[in-house]
């Protein structure tokens, strides 16, 4: 039969799906981040007829759970992993919490530890000025809390 008249399944035209990349470095998590990973694994394990994508996601989240390291709280007077930071950048006041890769959501103010902004803030204290984006004193840290 001619190929023109043969119905091909949608499966034949799908692009191959690769494993989700594991971010480099230690998998530091906050208590909230660990809870999010655990709930993601539980939700995926509860699926009886999982698709290939869901199975791939489950492998990823199981790996992230197995390597999760609950980070100790940072010092109260300096920015560290898990800190809530209020600062000014370009004349605008912003607030962020520094979290692990899997918990990060910049639109919700949750910055990944390895992001350039978080890296600039690490170690700063209230009242400090920090270089960012090639500018000295681009950021003024207003407050640091847990």
Language-model segments: which ranges?
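Helix-rich terminal scaffold detector
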Residues: 1-65
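Amphipathic alpha-helical coiled-coil segments
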Residues: 62-75
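Non-DNA-binding regulatory cores of transcription-related proteins
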Residues: 72-142
């Amino acid at each position: 039969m001619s190929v023109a008249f043969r119905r091909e399944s949608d499966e034949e035209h799908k692009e191959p799906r690769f494993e989700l990349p594991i971010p480099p470095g230690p998998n530091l998590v906050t208590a909230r981040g660990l809870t999010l990973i655990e709930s993601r694994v539980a939700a995926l394990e509860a699926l009886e007829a999982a698709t290939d994508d869901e199975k791939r996601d489950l492998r990823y989240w199981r790996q992230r759970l197995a390597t999760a390291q609950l980070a100790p709280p940072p010092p109260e007077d300096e920015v560290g992993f898990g800190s809530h930071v209020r600062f000014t950048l370009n004349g605008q006041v912003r607030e962020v919490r520094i979290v692990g890769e899997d918990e990060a959501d910049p639109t919700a103010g949750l910055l990944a530890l390895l992001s350039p902004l978080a890296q600039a803030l690490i170690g700063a204290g209230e009242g400090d000025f920090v270089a960012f984006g090639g500018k000295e004193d681009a950021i003024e840290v207003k407050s640091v809390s847990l």
